């Protein structure tokens, strides 16, 4: 709701990006939001403004977390709308009449002025968004991988040490979210890395730079909230 308040108080200072499909955007979206489906964001980086607060929003907050992290890597002032439309906006019960149906046009594209290093990062982010891929795995699918061939994957739990100790996915390695960068050398590069947190938000933020670095990193859908909701097993050792 803080993001919504900011958008209402000073709409000209906000650039709201709805990453959902065009069909879902057309059914109703945050007032003022433009539509850039997640898979198309790389092709539309040039429309992102450098002089506004960018708010990325999707369905659950997981793809918007990736998008915001990547935009930050490019120097944009970007944040993710936590929980997305399903778990962030819907619980506020503001009513469908607070949404708008009209499509808001994208601003004109502006080519950035980049040095060699900046161009490398820009190109890497631009290539991050292949069609029909959101880098998220369902809890049941991850459990199948853990049970079938645990040595072929890494499960990375980025919650607090206390919550990890209270119960985690079998074989999961623990590195708290704020410590991942300093300990990235502990994460194997030769196998897929499945990252879990509480609801998928910080996992989304984590996998974005990891994928840019060359990791095959995927976030768990809804994090341990999704895992527990599916009543899947945990261990405490």
Regions found by a protein language model. Give the residues of each.
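Rhodanese-like catalytic fold shared by cysteine-dependent sulfurtransferases
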Residues: 1-10, 26-53, 62-140, 145, ...
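Periplasmic peptidoglycan-binding/tethering modules of Gram-negative envelope proteins
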Residues: 11, 150
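Short hydrophobic beta-strand that contains or immediately precedes a catalytic carboxylate
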Residues: 15-20, 36, 142, 154-159, ...
């Amino acid at each position: 709701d803080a993001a919504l308040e900011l958008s209402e108080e000073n709409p000209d200072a906000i650039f709201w990006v709805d990453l959902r499909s065009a069909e879902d955007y057309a059914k109703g979206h945050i007032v003022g939001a433009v539509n850039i489906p997640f898979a198309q964001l790389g092709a539309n980086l040039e429309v992102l403004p450098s002089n506004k607060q960018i708010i990325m929003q999707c369905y659950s907050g997981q793809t918007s977390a990736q998008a915001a992290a990547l935009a930050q890597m490019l120097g944009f002032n970007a944040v993710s709308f936590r929980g997305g439309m399903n778990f962030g906006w819907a619980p506020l019960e503001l009513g469908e009449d607070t949404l708008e149906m009209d499509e808001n046009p994208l601003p004109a594209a502006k080519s950035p002025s980049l040095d060699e290093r900046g161009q490398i990062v820009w190109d890497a982010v631009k290539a991050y968004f292949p069609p029909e891929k959101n880098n998220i795995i369902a809890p049941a699918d991850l459990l199948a991988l853990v049970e079938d061939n645990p040595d072929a994957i890494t499960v990375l739990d980025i919650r607090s040490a206390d919550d990890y100790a209270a119960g985690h996915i079998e074989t999961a390695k623990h590195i708290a979210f704020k410590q991942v960068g300093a300990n990235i050398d502990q994460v194997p590069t030769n196998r897929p890395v499945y990252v879990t947190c509480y609801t998928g938000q910080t996992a989304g933020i984590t996998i974005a730079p990891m994928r840019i670095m060359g990791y095959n990193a995927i976030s768990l859908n809804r994090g341990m909230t999704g895992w527990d909701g599916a009543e899947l097993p945990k261990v405490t050792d």
